[in-house]
UniProtKB/Swiss-Prot annotation:
Residues 4-190 form the Flavodoxin-like domain. Binds 1 FMN per monomer. GO terms for cellular component: membrane. Its EC number is 1.6.5.2. It comes from Bradyrhizobium sp. (strain ORS 278). NAD(+) binds at residue 12. GO terms for molecular function: flavin adenine dinucleotide binding; FMN binding; NAD binding; NADH:ubiquinone reductase (non-electrogenic) activity; NADP binding; NADPH dehydrogenase (quinone) activity. Disulfide bonds: none annotated. Pfam families: FMN_red (PF03358). Coiled coil: none annotated. This is NAD(P)H dehydrogenase (quinone). It comes from the Bacteria. Belongs to the WrbA family. Keywords: Flavoprotein, FMN, NAD, NADP, Nucleotide-binding, Oxidoreductase.
Length: 199
């Protein structure tokens, strides 16, 4: 059975919600799915004072586990148009896997969130995708089979490069049904692609 890892970092819960939707989509395709998060780098007292969502159910990932999966779908909020340092720090530890070619041929994808419509969604996706390409992975985005990314009747995330959500400057906006549908779609397509490639 196809094994999929949804690997994420979420400070305020928006990416956690998107990760759960990505996982739902992958499960719809018949994959076995694990949802894991990367370690927090912000000290606990600072995270609490900043109202970080610290009660997330997903276990902490270990770098050596990445080789166990057929597909890895990576999500993180943006930090100035790039992936959050927590995710970058985790992926930077994959040098040993890279040196062995342990991730070559695996399927990868990316999803993100920004505070505003033009807050760096696509550049953040590119920073994730660039890492995955260097690992030797085959990238699957959010193709136009998902018609929701063409919507003009509401503010919505979504890009051919990956599922996205818009949080609002104060973080009060939660992922919309359309954005969650995009995440589910991407998860399903990635799992289907991994099944075709890896059986």
């Amino acid at each position: 059975m196809t094994k999929v890892l949804v690997l994420y970092y979420s400070a305020y819960g928006h990416i956690e919600a998107m990760a759960n939707a990505v996982a739902e989509g992958a499960r719809e395709a018949g994959a076995t799915v694990d949802i894991k998060r990367v370690p927090e780098l912000v000290p606990d007292d600072v995270a609490k004072a900043s109202y970080y969502k610290l009660d997330q159910a997903a276990p902490i990932a270990k770098i050596e586990e990445l080789a166990d999966y057929d597909a890895i779908i990576v999500g993180t909020g943006t930090r100035f148009g790039r992936m959050a340092s927590q995710m970058a720090n985790f992926l930077d530890q994959a040098g040993g896997l890279w040196a062995k070619g342990a991730l070559n041929g695996k399927v990868g994808g990316a999803f993100t969130s920004t505070a505003t419509q033009h807050g760096g969604q696509e550049t953040t996706l590119f920073t994730i995708i660039t890492n995955l390409l260097h690992f030797g992975m085959t990238i699957v985005g959010l193709n136009y089979g998902f018609a929701g990314q063409m919507k003009l009747d509401e503010v919505t995330g979504g890009s051919p490069y990956g599922a996205t959500t818009i949080t609002g400057g104060d973080g009060s906006r939660q992922p919309s049904e359309n954005e969650l549908a995009g995440a589910r779609y991407q998860g399903r397509v990635i799992a289907e692609t991994a099944k075709k490639l890896h059986g």
